Amino acid sequence: MTTASDAVVVGGGPVGAFAAWNLSKLGVDVTVFEEHAEVGVPSHCAGHLSIRGLKTLGLDNLPRGIVENTYSGANVYSAQGTKFSLRMRKPVTCAVNRALFDKFLIERAKKTGASVSLNSRVKSLVVKNGFVVGVSLDQKSKGENQSEAKVVVDCEGISSRLVRQAEPAALSSQELVYGVEAEVENIENVVSDEVGVYLGKDYAPGFYAWLMPRHDGSAKVGLAATRGNPKELFQRFLSKHPVASKQLSKAKVTQMTFHAISLGGPIRKTCANGFLVVGDAASQVKPTTGGGVIFGLTCARIASEVVAEAVRRKDFSSVCLEQYEDSCRSSLGFDFRTMLRARRFIYSLSDKKIDSALRFSSRFKLDEAMKGVDEIDLQGQMLVKALSKPALFAGLAYFLLLYLTTNP
Protein backbone atom coordinates (compact mmCIF):
# COMPACT_ATOMS: atom_id res chain seq x y z
CA MET A 1 0.00 0.00 0.00
CA THR A 2 1.34 3.44 -0.93
CA THR A 3 0.18 6.79 0.46
CA ALA A 4 1.25 10.27 -0.63
CA SER A 5 1.74 13.69 0.99
CA ASP A 6 3.50 16.94 0.19
CA ALA A 7 5.75 16.33 3.19
CA VAL A 8 6.51 13.42 5.48
CA VAL A 9 7.83 14.15 8.97
CA VAL A 10 9.76 11.30 10.57
CA GLY A 11 9.30 11.36 14.35
CA GLY A 12 6.49 12.68 16.52
CA GLY A 13 8.64 14.23 19.24
CA PRO A 14 8.48 17.97 19.95
CA VAL A 15 10.57 18.94 16.92
CA GLY A 16 8.63 16.72 14.50
CA ALA A 17 5.29 17.76 15.95
CA PHE A 18 6.18 21.46 15.80
CA ALA A 19 7.40 21.09 12.21
CA ALA A 20 4.14 19.38 11.25
CA TRP A 21 2.08 22.02 13.06
CA ASN A 22 3.84 24.84 11.22
CA LEU A 23 3.71 23.03 7.88
CA SER A 24 -0.01 22.40 8.15
CA LYS A 25 -0.63 26.03 9.15
CA LEU A 26 1.18 27.02 5.95
CA GLY A 27 -1.12 24.83 3.87
CA VAL A 28 1.24 21.90 3.31
CA ASP A 29 -0.28 18.40 3.25
CA VAL A 30 1.85 16.66 5.90
CA THR A 31 1.98 13.21 7.49
CA VAL A 32 3.88 12.37 10.69
CA PHE A 33 5.19 8.84 11.25
CA GLU A 34 5.96 7.97 14.88
CA GLU A 35 7.41 4.57 15.72
CA HIS A 36 5.97 4.34 19.24
CA ALA A 37 2.38 3.61 20.23
CA GLU A 38 2.17 6.86 22.19
CA VAL A 39 3.71 10.27 21.57
CA GLY A 40 6.05 11.47 24.33
CA VAL A 41 6.79 8.00 25.69
CA PRO A 42 9.50 7.14 26.54
CA SER A 43 10.92 10.54 27.48
CA HIS A 44 14.60 11.18 26.76
CA CYS A 45 14.90 14.74 28.02
CA ALA A 46 14.74 16.63 31.31
CA GLY A 47 12.36 19.19 29.83
CA HIS A 48 14.31 22.16 31.23
CA LEU A 49 13.39 25.02 28.88
CA SER A 50 13.92 28.76 28.80
CA ILE A 51 10.79 30.83 29.31
CA ARG A 52 12.02 33.44 26.84
CA GLY A 53 12.67 30.73 24.24
CA LEU A 54 9.14 29.38 24.59
CA LYS A 55 7.70 32.89 24.30
CA THR A 56 9.69 33.56 21.12
CA LEU A 57 8.18 30.40 19.64
CA GLY A 58 4.64 31.34 20.69
CA LEU A 59 4.52 28.61 23.34
CA ASP A 60 4.49 30.73 26.49
CA ASN A 61 0.84 30.01 27.39
CA LEU A 62 0.95 26.24 27.72
CA PRO A 63 -2.09 24.40 29.10
CA ARG A 64 -2.28 23.75 32.82
CA GLY A 65 -0.24 20.78 33.99
CA ILE A 66 2.48 20.88 31.33
CA VAL A 67 4.73 23.26 33.28
CA GLU A 68 5.79 21.48 36.47
CA ASN A 69 7.90 24.27 37.96
CA THR A 70 9.64 27.56 37.18
CA TYR A 71 13.14 28.52 38.28
CA SER A 72 14.58 31.88 39.31
CA GLY A 73 17.92 30.61 40.56
CA ALA A 74 20.73 28.13 40.08
CA ASN A 75 23.47 26.70 42.27
CA VAL A 76 26.69 25.46 40.70
CA TYR A 77 28.78 23.09 42.83
CA SER A 78 32.38 22.05 42.35
CA ALA A 79 33.63 18.53 43.03
CA GLN A 80 34.86 19.83 46.40
CA GLY A 81 31.45 21.26 47.31
CA THR A 82 32.10 24.96 46.68
CA LYS A 83 28.87 26.70 45.68
CA PHE A 84 28.28 29.61 43.33
CA SER A 85 24.67 30.83 43.45
CA LEU A 86 22.72 32.86 40.91
CA ARG A 87 19.41 34.49 41.71
CA MET A 88 17.50 36.21 38.91
CA ARG A 89 14.89 38.92 39.28
CA LYS A 90 12.20 36.69 37.79
CA PRO A 91 11.77 33.08 36.62
CA VAL A 92 14.05 32.39 33.67
CA THR A 93 13.52 28.68 33.02
CA CYS A 94 10.85 26.07 33.57
CA ALA A 95 10.48 22.32 33.80
CA VAL A 96 7.87 20.82 31.50
CA ASN A 97 6.35 17.38 31.61
CA ARG A 98 7.81 16.12 28.36
CA ALA A 99 5.08 13.57 27.68
CA LEU A 100 2.35 16.20 28.06
CA PHE A 101 4.37 18.80 26.14
CA ASP A 102 4.90 16.44 23.22
CA LYS A 103 1.22 15.45 23.21
CA PHE A 104 0.17 19.11 23.22
CA LEU A 105 2.28 19.83 20.14
CA ILE A 106 1.11 16.77 18.21
CA GLU A 107 -2.54 17.58 18.98
CA ARG A 108 -2.02 21.12 17.67
CA ALA A 109 -0.55 19.64 14.50
CA LYS A 110 -3.55 17.36 14.08
CA LYS A 111 -6.01 20.20 14.66
CA THR A 112 -4.44 22.22 11.86
CA GLY A 113 -4.69 19.32 9.43
CA ALA A 114 -1.62 17.13 9.86
CA SER A 115 -2.06 13.35 9.70
CA VAL A 116 -0.35 11.35 12.45
CA SER A 117 0.40 7.65 12.17
CA LEU A 118 1.57 5.85 15.34
CA ASN A 119 3.28 2.45 15.49
CA SER A 120 4.91 3.41 12.19
CA ARG A 121 8.64 2.86 11.99
CA VAL A 122 10.41 4.43 9.03
CA LYS A 123 12.94 1.87 7.84
CA SER A 124 14.64 3.81 5.06
CA LEU A 125 14.37 6.59 2.53
CA VAL A 126 13.04 5.93 -0.96
CA VAL A 127 15.43 7.50 -3.48
CA LYS A 128 14.86 7.89 -7.23
CA ASN A 129 17.14 9.71 -9.67
CA GLY A 130 19.08 11.29 -6.82
CA PHE A 131 16.00 12.65 -5.03
CA VAL A 132 14.40 11.46 -1.80
CA VAL A 133 10.79 10.79 -2.84
CA GLY A 134 9.35 9.06 0.21
CA VAL A 135 9.96 6.55 2.98
CA SER A 136 9.72 2.81 3.44
CA LEU A 137 7.61 1.87 6.48
CA ASP A 138 6.95 -0.95 8.86
CA GLN A 139 3.52 -0.29 10.37
CA LYS A 140 2.09 -2.46 13.10
CA SER A 141 -1.43 -2.41 11.65
CA LYS A 142 -0.57 -2.48 7.93
CA GLY A 143 2.78 -4.24 7.63
CA GLU A 144 5.43 -2.99 5.24
CA ASN A 145 4.58 -0.27 2.72
CA GLN A 146 5.72 3.07 1.36
CA SER A 147 4.66 6.68 1.68
CA GLU A 148 5.48 9.07 -1.13
CA ALA A 149 6.48 12.65 -0.39
CA LYS A 150 7.90 15.64 -2.18
CA VAL A 151 10.04 16.38 0.89
CA VAL A 152 11.01 14.21 3.86
CA VAL A 153 11.71 16.11 7.10
CA ASP A 154 13.82 13.92 9.36
CA CYS A 155 13.13 14.54 13.07
CA GLU A 156 13.93 11.01 14.22
CA GLY A 157 16.32 12.03 17.01
CA ILE A 158 19.89 11.14 17.76
CA SER A 159 19.89 7.76 16.02
CA SER A 160 20.34 9.65 12.72
CA ARG A 161 19.71 6.52 10.61
CA LEU A 162 18.20 8.42 7.71
CA VAL A 163 20.91 11.07 7.71
CA ARG A 164 23.48 8.34 7.15
CA GLN A 165 21.53 7.19 4.10
CA ALA A 166 20.94 10.67 2.67
CA GLU A 167 24.24 12.36 3.51
CA PRO A 168 26.72 9.92 5.08
CA ALA A 169 29.50 12.49 5.51
CA ALA A 170 27.27 14.83 7.51
CA LEU A 171 27.76 13.16 10.89
CA SER A 172 31.50 13.64 11.25
CA SER A 173 31.09 16.52 13.71
CA GLN A 174 29.15 14.53 16.30
CA GLU A 175 30.55 14.47 19.84
CA LEU A 176 28.50 12.27 22.12
CA VAL A 177 28.03 12.10 25.87
CA TYR A 178 26.02 9.34 27.48
CA GLY A 179 23.43 10.24 30.06
CA VAL A 180 21.09 8.88 32.68
CA GLU A 181 18.06 10.63 34.14
CA ALA A 182 15.94 9.58 37.08
CA GLU A 183 12.67 10.55 38.68
CA VAL A 184 13.45 10.92 42.38
CA GLU A 185 11.32 11.41 45.50
CA ASN A 186 12.21 12.73 48.99
CA ILE A 187 14.93 15.25 48.21
CA GLU A 188 16.15 17.48 51.06
CA ASN A 189 17.83 20.86 51.63
CA VAL A 190 16.89 22.15 48.18
CA VAL A 191 15.14 25.42 47.32
CA SER A 192 12.26 24.45 45.05
CA ASP A 193 12.80 27.21 42.46
CA GLU A 194 16.55 26.72 42.09
CA VAL A 195 18.23 24.14 39.86
CA GLY A 196 21.44 22.41 40.86
CA VAL A 197 24.46 21.89 38.60
CA TYR A 198 27.23 19.60 39.87
CA LEU A 199 30.71 19.42 38.36
CA GLY A 200 33.46 16.91 38.93
CA LYS A 201 35.42 14.41 36.88
CA ASP A 202 34.72 11.61 39.37
CA TYR A 203 30.95 12.06 38.93
CA ALA A 204 30.32 13.37 35.41
CA PRO A 205 33.59 13.48 33.44
CA GLY A 206 33.36 15.78 30.45
CA PHE A 207 29.93 17.12 31.38
CA TYR A 208 27.89 17.65 34.57
CA ALA A 209 25.09 16.38 36.81
CA TRP A 210 21.82 18.20 37.44
CA LEU A 211 18.90 18.39 39.85
CA MET A 212 15.58 20.00 38.92
CA PRO A 213 13.29 20.13 41.97
CA ARG A 214 9.53 20.28 42.11
CA HIS A 215 7.45 21.80 44.90
CA ASP A 216 6.31 18.38 46.19
CA GLY A 217 9.80 17.19 47.16
CA SER A 218 10.39 15.21 43.98
CA ALA A 219 12.94 16.04 41.30
CA LYS A 220 14.49 15.12 38.01
CA VAL A 221 18.10 14.14 38.68
CA GLY A 222 20.60 13.12 36.03
CA LEU A 223 24.07 13.32 34.61
CA ALA A 224 25.97 12.74 31.39
CA ALA A 225 29.60 11.90 30.75
CA THR A 226 32.09 11.37 27.96
CA ARG A 227 33.40 8.19 29.55
CA GLY A 228 32.44 5.63 32.17
CA ASN A 229 29.21 3.75 32.83
CA PRO A 230 26.38 6.29 33.37
CA LYS A 231 24.56 4.08 35.87
CA GLU A 232 27.68 3.52 37.96
CA LEU A 233 28.55 7.23 37.81
CA PHE A 234 25.01 8.07 38.90
CA GLN A 235 25.23 5.80 41.94
CA ARG A 236 28.58 7.36 42.87
CA PHE A 237 27.08 10.83 42.47
CA LEU A 238 24.16 9.96 44.77
CA SER A 239 26.38 8.51 47.47
CA LYS A 240 29.68 10.39 47.24
CA HIS A 241 29.24 13.95 45.96
CA PRO A 242 29.81 16.26 48.98
CA VAL A 243 26.59 18.20 48.38
CA ALA A 244 24.29 15.93 46.37
CA SER A 245 24.83 12.99 48.72
CA LYS A 246 23.23 15.05 51.52
CA GLN A 247 20.38 16.36 49.37
CA LEU A 248 19.62 12.84 48.14
CA SER A 249 20.44 10.76 51.22
CA LYS A 250 16.79 9.71 51.66
CA ALA A 251 15.86 9.84 47.99
CA LYS A 252 13.97 7.07 46.27
CA VAL A 253 14.55 6.53 42.55
CA THR A 254 11.22 5.69 40.91
CA GLN A 255 12.22 5.70 37.24
CA MET A 256 15.44 5.74 35.25
CA THR A 257 16.16 6.27 31.54
CA PHE A 258 19.37 6.32 29.50
CA HIS A 259 20.15 8.34 26.38
CA ALA A 260 22.96 9.86 24.34
CA ILE A 261 23.40 13.60 23.70
CA SER A 262 25.22 15.09 20.72
CA LEU A 263 27.33 18.13 21.65
CA GLY A 264 29.46 18.77 18.57
CA GLY A 265 27.23 21.46 17.11
CA PRO A 266 25.11 21.15 13.95
CA ILE A 267 26.16 18.58 11.38
CA ARG A 268 27.85 19.94 8.27
CA LYS A 269 25.04 19.19 5.84
CA THR A 270 21.37 19.33 6.83
CA CYS A 271 19.70 18.99 3.44
CA ALA A 272 19.76 16.97 0.23
CA ASN A 273 17.43 16.67 -2.75
CA GLY A 274 13.97 16.19 -1.22
CA PHE A 275 15.33 15.88 2.32
CA LEU A 276 15.85 18.02 5.44
CA VAL A 277 17.08 17.01 8.90
CA VAL A 278 16.05 18.90 12.04
CA GLY A 279 16.65 18.69 15.79
CA ASP A 280 18.78 16.09 17.55
CA ALA A 281 19.27 14.20 14.28
CA ALA A 282 21.06 17.33 13.00
CA SER A 283 22.85 17.84 16.34
CA GLN A 284 21.07 21.18 16.82
CA VAL A 285 21.81 20.93 20.53
CA LYS A 286 23.49 23.44 22.86
CA PRO A 287 27.07 22.19 23.35
CA THR A 288 27.24 23.72 26.83
CA THR A 289 24.12 22.24 28.41
CA GLY A 290 22.90 19.50 26.06
CA GLY A 291 19.52 21.20 25.70
CA GLY A 292 18.03 20.74 22.26
CA VAL A 293 14.33 21.49 22.45
CA ILE A 294 14.31 25.27 21.93
CA PHE A 295 16.92 25.20 19.16
CA GLY A 296 15.21 22.19 17.58
CA LEU A 297 11.85 23.97 17.58
CA THR A 298 13.46 27.12 16.17
CA CYS A 299 14.99 25.15 13.30
CA ALA A 300 11.72 23.25 12.78
CA ARG A 301 9.92 26.53 12.20
CA ILE A 302 12.57 27.61 9.70
CA ALA A 303 12.35 24.23 7.96
CA SER A 304 8.57 24.47 7.64
CA GLU A 305 8.81 27.87 5.96
CA VAL A 306 11.41 26.61 3.48
CA VAL A 307 9.43 23.45 2.69
CA ALA A 308 6.22 25.45 2.19
CA GLU A 309 8.04 27.69 -0.29
CA ALA A 310 9.51 24.63 -2.05
CA VAL A 311 6.01 23.17 -2.41
CA ARG A 312 4.75 26.46 -3.82
CA ARG A 313 7.61 26.62 -6.33
CA LYS A 314 7.60 22.86 -7.00
CA ASP A 315 11.36 22.83 -6.50
CA PHE A 316 12.66 20.21 -4.06
CA SER A 317 16.31 20.32 -5.01
CA SER A 318 19.05 20.77 -2.45
CA VAL A 319 19.74 24.18 -4.01
CA CYS A 320 16.23 25.30 -3.01
CA LEU A 321 16.25 23.58 0.38
CA GLU A 322 19.66 25.02 1.30
CA GLN A 323 17.80 28.17 2.36
CA TYR A 324 16.96 26.19 5.51
CA GLU A 325 20.62 25.50 6.21
CA ASP A 326 21.60 29.10 5.50
CA SER A 327 18.85 30.52 7.73
CA CYS A 328 19.70 28.22 10.64
CA ARG A 329 23.37 29.11 10.35
CA SER A 330 22.58 32.83 10.18
CA SER A 331 20.28 32.68 13.21
CA LEU A 332 22.23 30.32 15.47
CA GLY A 333 25.69 29.74 14.01
CA PHE A 334 27.54 32.29 16.16
CA ASP A 335 25.96 30.96 19.33
CA PHE A 336 26.77 27.35 18.45
CA ARG A 337 30.42 28.21 17.77
CA THR A 338 30.71 30.19 21.00
CA MET A 339 29.10 27.47 23.09
CA LEU A 340 31.27 24.76 21.56
CA ARG A 341 34.44 26.67 22.43
CA ALA A 342 33.11 27.45 25.92
CA ARG A 343 32.34 23.80 26.63
CA ARG A 344 35.75 22.61 25.49
CA PHE A 345 37.40 25.32 27.58
CA ILE A 346 35.44 24.61 30.77
CA TYR A 347 35.88 20.86 30.64
CA SER A 348 39.59 21.18 29.94
CA LEU A 349 39.99 22.65 33.44
CA SER A 350 40.86 20.46 36.38
CA ASP A 351 38.42 20.09 39.28
CA LYS A 352 40.76 22.26 41.35
CA LYS A 353 40.70 25.07 38.79
CA ILE A 354 36.92 24.94 38.54
CA ASP A 355 36.70 25.14 42.33
CA SER A 356 38.95 28.23 42.25
CA ALA A 357 36.80 29.77 39.53
CA LEU A 358 33.62 29.32 41.57
CA ARG A 359 35.30 30.86 44.63
CA PHE A 360 36.41 33.81 42.51
CA SER A 361 32.91 34.24 41.09
CA SER A 362 31.40 34.40 44.57
CA ARG A 363 34.11 36.69 45.95
CA PHE A 364 33.73 39.20 43.13
CA LYS A 365 29.93 39.00 43.26
CA LEU A 366 29.46 37.94 39.66
CA ASP A 367 25.99 36.81 40.68
CA GLU A 368 24.98 40.45 41.16
CA ALA A 369 26.19 41.32 37.67
CA MET A 370 24.12 38.49 36.18
CA LYS A 371 20.80 39.18 37.91
CA GLY A 372 19.22 40.73 34.85
CA VAL A 373 20.06 37.85 32.53
CA ASP A 374 17.02 36.24 30.91
CA GLU A 375 18.57 34.89 27.69
CA ILE A 376 20.08 31.45 28.23
CA ASP A 377 19.64 29.96 24.76
CA LEU A 378 21.61 32.39 22.59
CA GLN A 379 24.69 32.16 24.79
CA GLY A 380 27.08 33.71 22.29
CA GLN A 381 24.98 36.86 22.12
CA MET A 382 24.58 36.76 25.91
CA LEU A 383 28.37 36.68 26.31
CA VAL A 384 28.85 39.72 24.06
CA LYS A 385 26.36 41.71 26.17
CA ALA A 386 27.97 40.48 29.40
CA LEU A 387 31.38 41.82 28.39
CA SER A 388 30.02 45.36 28.70
CA LYS A 389 29.82 44.81 32.47
CA PRO A 390 33.18 45.29 34.26
CA ALA A 391 32.62 42.51 36.79
CA LEU A 392 31.79 39.95 34.13
CA PHE A 393 34.70 41.10 31.98
CA ALA A 394 37.00 40.57 34.97
CA GLY A 395 35.45 37.15 35.49
CA LEU A 396 36.15 36.15 31.90
CA ALA A 397 39.74 37.37 32.22
CA TYR A 398 40.15 35.23 35.33
CA PHE A 399 38.80 32.15 33.54
CA LEU A 400 41.26 32.74 30.71
CA LEU A 401 44.08 33.04 33.24
CA LEU A 402 43.06 29.70 34.71
CA TYR A 403 43.15 28.15 31.29
CA LEU A 404 46.58 29.52 30.45
CA THR A 405 48.27 28.61 33.72
CA THR A 406 49.90 25.22 33.94
CA ASN A 407 49.37 24.50 37.63
CA PRO A 408 46.56 21.93 38.18
Each model region followed by its residue ranges:
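Beta1/beta-strand and adjacent pyrophosphate-binding region of the FAD-binding site
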Residues: 1-15
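FAD/FMN-dependent oxidoreductases across multiple families
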Residues: 124, 229-306, 312, 318, ...
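Conserved hydrophobic helix-helix packing surfaces used for dimerization/oligomerization
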Residues: 7-9, 30, 275
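Conserved Rossmann-like nucleotide-cofactor binding loop
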Residues: 15, 38, 159
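C-terminal helical "tail/cap" subdomain of flavin- and related membrane-associated enzymes
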Residues: 308-408
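Glycine-rich FAD pyrophosphate-binding loop
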Residues: 21-44
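Predominantly flavin-linked oxidoreductase catalytic cores and closely associated redox partners
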Residues: 108-248, 283
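A conserved beta-strand/loop capping segment in the N-terminal third of enzymes
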Residues: 50-104
